[in-house]
A protein has these predicted regions:
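Short glycine-rich, low-complexity segments
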Residues: 1-28, 72-83
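Acidic, low-complexity, intrinsically disordered interaction modules
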Residues: 24-69
């Protein structure tokens, strides 16, 4: 999944103050909520960093392994799925 696509959908989730579910290899799911979480994408490394403000912990995910990102908009789920 491209870093640009990841940024677009996570920016939209942030703008709408909604959750984003990030699925990694169909086994692991990260729920980035509107409160207490932040993220950044390192384009040059193709890595997504998820930051939990409460625990002050960072999780790094190679964007190659992200299989899907889903956000909720007006009671509908919208997904970005890796081809």
């Amino acid at each position: 999944m491209t870093t640009d696509a990841i940024n677009v959908i996570l920016d939209k989730a942030w703008e709408l103050n909604t959750h984003a579910l990030i699925f990694v290899d169909d086994r692991t799911r990260f729920d980035i909520g509107p409160d207490g979480w932040d993220w950044r994408v390192y384009d040059d490394l193709e890595v997504l960093c998820i930051y939990n403000k409460e625990s002050n912990m960072e999780t790094y995910i190679d964007t190659e392994y992200i299989s899907e990102i889903t956000i909720q908009i007006d009671d509908e789920q919208h997904s970005l799925v890796k081809n």
